[in-house]
């Protein structure tokens, strides 16, 4: 099947300035992400950035760049600019791979594209089982609950679903009822065009989760369990050191 990968790579980062260019074992982080995307079999891979230094690093590695505005409020807005500049047809399958995921398995990039292509829905994503209480109660780990057909009912930083009987006995263990959301998305290009014209939703602002806008407006998001759980993403200096060690 045919799909396009777009990798948003914003240069400014509060915790890690210049994050896309941080060195991981001799290569800029963004180049590692580009290489994972190439392994997925995508027809076309585009790095969307607002910074010339990132563009030069990607082009030096043989990658394609689309320069975007610096004032986007979200990664999806940056994707929308690329979709318009490239003139993708509404039915083009687009996979959004985060620029700070140098250890993302190529197999799940393709998985989310295939899941979307097989369904009459505008958006798809992935999740992974939660096995520890630490994850279940961590607000930085986004949980998702699904309906009987694998469509998202809700995403939350809260512990959902709340296991009333188990948690009444203590919060040390969790059962098999929890899924954590993975930050990889597949979209049809036409859906991206519609999405950016919707006003942000109240729930989106409360949880600070952009995908809640989709549910607020009555659209469906298909969620599959990832065939392979991705490694550490890079949000902090500690994450960076961990990734460097794991990728040696």
UniProtKB/Swiss-Prot annotation:
Query: Which GO cellular component terms, listed alphabetically, does the Swiss-Prot or TrEMBL entry include?
Result: cytosol
One annotated GO molecular function = 3-deoxy-manno-octulosonate cytidylyltransferase activity
Which keywords does UniProt give here? Cytoplasm, Lipopolysaccharide biosynthesis, Nucleotidyltransferase, Transferase
Instruction: Name the CDD domains for this protein.
Output: CMP-KDO-Synthetase (cd02517)
Localization of this protein: Cytoplasm
The protein's superkingdom reads Bacteria
- What NCBIfam families does this protein's entry cite? kdsB, PRK05450.1-3, PRK05450.1-5, PRK13368.1
Q: What is the protein named?
A: 3-deoxy-manno-octulosonate cytidylyltransferase
Organism in which the protein naturally occurs: Escherichia fergusonii (strain ATCC 35469 / DSM 13698 / CCUG 18766 / IAM 14443 / JCM 21226 / LMG 7866 / NBRC 102419 / NCTC 12128 / CDC 0568-73)
What high-level taxonomic lineage is stated for the organism? Bacteria, Pseudomonadati, Pseudomonadota, Gammaproteobacteria, Enterobacterales
Q: Which gene encodes it?
A: kdsB
